[in-house]
Amino acid sequence: METYSVWNRIYDYINPIAFKIFDISVHWYGIMYVSAMLIALLIAKAFITYRNERFPITQELLDSFFIWVEIGVILGGRIGYVLIYSPNRWEYLMQPWQMFNPYTNGVFVGISGFSYHGAMAGFVLAAIIFCYVKKQSFWIFMDLSAISIPLGYVFGRIGNFFNHELFGRVIESDSSLRDIGILVNGELRYPSQLFEAFAEGIIVFILLICLLRYAKKPGTLLVAYGVFYALARFVCEYFREADSQMGYFVFGLSMGQILSLVMLVISIFLGLFVFVQKPISSQKIKHQRKKK
């Protein structure tokens, strides 16, 4: 009979609910999501303070931008999940307000289901509108976002881990990796949430930091983020269980992998456009500052 370590049984010691306020449960995922936003904002503030020649953005503009894109993330993430993953998408489309209704039969159950790729689409759309309205450089704001998001993303995936969701695939009985497995319903599964936190968050951030000094053209960091994230997500999906309502598609690919390939192709084509852009010059920076 197989014995399990404390790590294998870690879910026995982690309650998805951090605490309750009256009858409302506050989940770890919610706490981690807020932490992710704050970390990303703090990193962005650090870059516009210490690398202002690369990111000529004021604190006031950054705060305003953050509010705009956060609305885009919430709307895009939820709508994206409903359209791509939810088996009840047609019911939601008939009553779209139900996408954001945290109550079921008068009981608070929260809002379940959030798509990263949908959130990214909402983020970009909100950024485009913001930069158009405020007459700002879309590429500079997106470069700043690209290098600020990854470490915040780490907290989001840890939140998934604490919330007992987005489980990894079952580890084969003869695999030497069973020691790192997490026991879920009697089966050892890969801690794919932590794999994603490391690969899509920490590794991507390190790569972008290494690229920063060479990224002279606006949009370079955005393109690099798209490529790095898409590749990391594609690989990590091999350790992550596909959504039960979706399953696997052509060549055994998950929906996450298909969307990552789409993201990779878009990033490459975007890179061709960025390649012909002029480097950020001191004259352009001065012009940006005068407009503020």
Swiss-Prot record:
Belongs to the Lgt family. It is found in: Cell inner membrane. Its EC number is 2.5.1.145. Catalyzes the transfer of the diacylglyceryl group from phosphatidylglycerol to the sulfhydryl group of the N-terminal cysteine of a prolipoprotein, the first step in the formation of mature lipoproteins. GO terms for biological process: lipoprotein biosynthetic process. The chain crosses the membrane at residues 24-44, 65-85, 110-130, 136-156, 192-212, 219-239, 256-276. Keywords: Cell inner membrane, Cell membrane, Membrane, Transferase, Transmembrane, Transmembrane helix. A 1,2-diacyl-sn-glycero-3-phospho-(1'-sn-glycerol) binds at R157. One of its GO terms (cellular component) is plasma membrane. It is a multi-pass membrane protein. It comes from Helicobacter hepaticus (strain ATCC 51449 / 3B1). Pathway: Protein modification; lipoprotein biosynthesis (diacylglyceryl transfer). InterPro entries: Lgt (IPR001640). One of its GO terms (molecular function) is phosphatidylglycerol-prolipoprotein diacylglyceryl transferase activity. This is Phosphatidylglycerol--prolipoprotein diacylglyceryl transferase. Pfam families: LGT (PF01790).
